[in-house]
UniProtKB/Swiss-Prot annotation:
Homotetramer. GMP binds at residues 69, 92-96, 134-135. This is Xanthine-guanine phosphoribosyltransferase. GO terms for molecular function: guanine phosphoribosyltransferase activity; guanosine tetraphosphate binding; hypoxanthine phosphoribosyltransferase activity; identical protein binding; magnesium ion binding; xanthine phosphoribosyltransferase activity. E.coli cells express two distinct 6-oxopurine PRTases, with very different specificities for hypoxanthine, guanine, and xanthine. Salvage enzymes allow a more energy efficient synthesis of purine nucleoside monophosphates compared with the de novo pathway. The kinetic analysis suggests that E.coli HPRT is mainly responsible for the synthesis of IMP and that XGPRT primarily salvages guanine and xanthine. Xanthine binds at residues 92, 135. Its main location: membrane. It is a peripheral membrane protein. Coiled coil: none annotated. GO terms for biological process: GMP salvage; IMP salvage; protein homotetramerization; purine ribonucleoside salvage; XMP salvage. The keyword Cell wall biogenesis/degradation does not apply. The gene is gpt. SUPFAM superfamilies: PRTase-like (SSF53271). Purine salvage pathway enzyme that catalyzes the transfer of the ribosyl-5-phosphate group from 5-phospho-alpha-D-ribose 1-diphosphate (PRPP) to the N9 position of the 6-oxopurines guanine and xanthine to form the corresponding ribonucleotides GMP (guanosine 5'-monophosphate) and XMP (xanthosine 5'-monophosphate), with the release of PPi. To a lesser extent, also acts on hypoxanthine. Does not ribophosphorylate adenine.
Length: 152
């Protein structure tokens, strides 16, 4: 990855509200399925904005065996996804997205960020990200003191 894209908490909330506005009216949804772990925070933000109380998770772990990504489903929400929003923070190469589509073929799959390789796999997203860019999410960063340039 050659570039970094830093996401602040404020930016994330703005993007989540924009996505939520596209998902109105909220009464059409039975609930939200958040993809753990990246979709947990965006899922909470969508649940708040849409007034949705039914929130479930699908937990997928990816392993790298000899440069081949293997996905393992640790926990899944029941059903085929009909009437549900499935949310993840990002669609990148599409590996996780393909698994999600297979598990929940009738769900409305959304992300906050989308890279070109994964874009065709989601129903909606907010921010285009170049394929070779690494996203730093706010939950993966800590706030640290940065001394003034002058050193005084």
């Amino acid at each position: 990855m050659s570039e970094k894209y830093i996401v602040t908490w404020d930016m994330l909330q703005i993007h989540a509200r924009k996505l939520a506005s596209r998902l109105m009216p909220s009464e059409q949804w039975k609930g939200i399925i958040a993809v753990s772990r990246g979709g947990l925070v965006p899922g909470a933000l969508l649940a708040r904005e849409l007034g949705i109380r039914h929130v479930d998770t699908v937990c997928i772990s990816s392993y790298d065996h000899d440069n081949q990504r293997e996905l393992k489903v640790l926990k899944r929400a029941e059903g085929d996804g009909e009437g549900f929003i499935v949310i993840d923070d990002l669609v990148d190469t599409g590996g996780t997205a393909v698994a999600i589509r297979e598990m929940y073929p009738k769900a409305h799959f959304v992300t906050i960020f989308a890279k070109p390789a994964g874009r065709p796999l989601v129903d909606d997203y907010v921010v285009d990200i170049p394929q070779d860019t690494w996203i730093e999410q706010p939950w993966d960063m800590g706030v640290v003191f940065v001394p003034p340039i002058s050193g005084r």
